[in-house]
UniProtKB/Swiss-Prot annotation:
<keyword id="KW-0444">Lipid biosynthesis</keyword>
<dbReference type="GO" id="GO:0016024">
    <property type="term" value="P:CDP-diacylglycerol biosynthetic process"/>
</dbReference>
<dbReference type="Pfam" id="PF01553">
    <property type="entry name" value="Acyltransferase"/>
</dbReference>
<keyword id="KW-0997">Cell inner membrane</keyword>
<keyword id="KW-0808">Transferase</keyword>
<dbReference type="InterPro" id="IPR002123">
    <property type="entry name" value="Plipid/glycerol_acylTrfase"/>
</dbReference>
<comment type="pathway">
    <text>Phospholipid metabolism; CDP-diacylglycerol biosynthesis; CDP-diacylglycerol from sn-glycerol 3-phosphate: step 2/3.</text>
</comment>
<keyword id="KW-1208">Phospholipid metabolism</keyword>
<dbReference type="GO" id="GO:0006654">
    <property type="term" value="P:phosphatidic acid biosynthetic process"/>
</dbReference>
<dbReference type="GO" id="GO:0005886">
    <property type="term" value="C:plasma membrane"/>
</dbReference>
<keyword id="KW-1003">Cell membrane</keyword>
<feature type="short sequence motif" description="HXXXXD motif">
    <location>
        <begin position="73"/>
        <end position="78"/>
    </location>
</feature>
<keyword id="KW-0594">Phospholipid biosynthesis</keyword>
<comment type="function">
    <text>Converts lysophosphatidic acid (LPA) into phosphatidic acid by incorporating an acyl moiety at the 2 position. This enzyme can utilize either acyl-CoA or acyl-acyl-carrier-protein as the fatty acyl donor.</text>
</comment>
<keyword id="KW-0472">Membrane</keyword>
<protein>
    <recommendedName>
        <fullName>1-acyl-sn-glycerol-3-phosphate acyltransferase</fullName>
        <ecNumber>2.3.1.51</ecNumber>
    </recommendedName>
</protein>
<dbReference type="InterPro" id="IPR004552">
    <property type="entry name" value="AGP_acyltrans"/>
</dbReference>
Amino acid sequence: MLYIFRLIVTVIYSILVCVFGSIYCLFSPRNPKHVATFGHMFGRLAPLFGLKVECRKPADAENYGNAIYIANHQNNYDMVTAANIVQPPTVTVGKKSLLWIPFFGQLYWLTGNLLIDRNNRAKAHSTIAAVVNHFKKRRISIWMFPEGTRSRGRGLLPFKTGAFHAAIAAGVPIIPVCVSNTSNKVNLNRLNNGLVIVEMLPPVDVSEYGKDQVRELAAHCRALMEQKIAELDKEVAEREATGKV
């Protein structure tokens, strides 16, 4: 019964946000500030799923300039966990096929997110150039999932290099965002599904990395994130075991 209730409320809420959000965005289409606004709105679904989301970020995070945010990509619950920490004006890079999801796809495009064709390598490379161009023209940040796909309980997957190519070419820092494990954590028939911690790490300076050191930069960032995620998972387990959620 709880499962059905959650499903109905989620569908109704999501459709309302997407429909009225799309209408709202028509007054200033493709404005990158919209992404954080509606990301946080989807983040409000976390309590409905029985999740307590705890966000941590550096004190001066709101003053960061242009940057590329990278986060671990686990499952669809990223929409209600990681979305809570998105800073304006940040846009995401997603698959072109997202555009065809009813209601959501239209909002995704109108909020200013970038769409890439993963099946066309040439177009994917041109997207990196477009990202760099965006940085040169305006104050904007980009959010990317360097794993390229949902990990679904397989741990932190190997990183693709697109985000790191773009960061070096644009001369902007990389800001890792780490989310504690959510794989097999949510049971929609269970009232309380525990704690999820989302932590933003300090910026990684890319100025010391050349174009031929992209993989080194990717490996460095992945190591930072892997260590932090392990720490967060340990903390979550300890707090849930002692009831200090």
